[in-house]
Amino acid sequence: MSSAHFNRGPAYGLSAEVKNKLAQKYDHQREQELREWIEGVTGRRIGNNFMDGLKDGIILCEFINKLQPGSVKKVNESTQNWHQLENIGNFIKAITKYGVKPHDIFEANDLFENTNHTQVQSTLLALASMAKTKGNKVNVGVKYAEKQERKFEPEKLREGRNIIGLQMGTNKFASQQGMTAYGTRRHLYDPKLGTDQPLDQATISLQMGTNKGASQAGMTAPGTKRQIFEPGLGMEHCDTLNVSLQMGSNKGASQRGMTVYGLPRQVYDPKYCLTPEYPELGEPAHNHHPHNYYNSA
């Protein structure tokens, strides 16, 4: 079986865009540093193409065996694809036991099928950092910080409860001291002065407004009746002769005499019509002609 069987075809669309972005993150300077480190440890030449030289997994297995002897029991020298994949899988298991974090490790297909060389490079850099942490002389990677454990006595831990952490704010400079929650009532007296809280309703809180300056005293709610007399003067309305402003005016043009929509309208005006007179018994009826009912003089 040839290795071409495992090669993927060209990527298109979104897959091609993702592949190009991953390729742009590949660092060729780091590749040269990793090449020198691996060749120096194993004593073997990788070749012109760095990833193709690591693709069979042989150099990788020998490399981890140099860092941690006995990590890979058997290294397959065969050119068969499954043997090469087995070497890569054994290398991944070995570096996991060595201490490399799982999220830093590449997958076998990332190297064997050339899908993500950037992740392969990141794994080798993480391996270099772990090797440097373990004391190996490596010029690549960053040494991981060691744990600095501290043990405190219970008395010290209890004392820490009296300290206000920075996350809780500060008790100096400008603060929200004296501020009340939104919607709560604020009084005009200060409890620090030792005065008792008033028991009547004479104290006006700041949230209720002020009793000086312009105010809404005397204002009524929309739709309520407004009287034209002032109750503060001791005047009381005892009759219905006082017309409120909301009822309109009794002077000028008005709607007096208007009827509700739909009611019948009379064609005569009672002011200009006489009261009809009916003939008495024995009186001639011609004197009471219908036209005599109107004042036509």
Curated annotation (Swiss-Prot):
The modification Phosphothreonine is found at residues 170, 180, 184, 259. CDD domains: CH_CNN1. Residues 28-131 form the Calponin-homology (CH) domain. GO terms for cellular component: actin cytoskeleton. It comes from the Eukaryota. Keywords: Actin-binding, Calmodulin-binding, Phosphoprotein, Repeat. Part of cGMP kinase signaling complex at least composed of ACTA2/alpha-actin, CNN1/calponin H1, PLN/phospholamban, PRKG1 and ITPR1. This is Calponin-1. It comes from Ovis aries. The gene is CNN1.
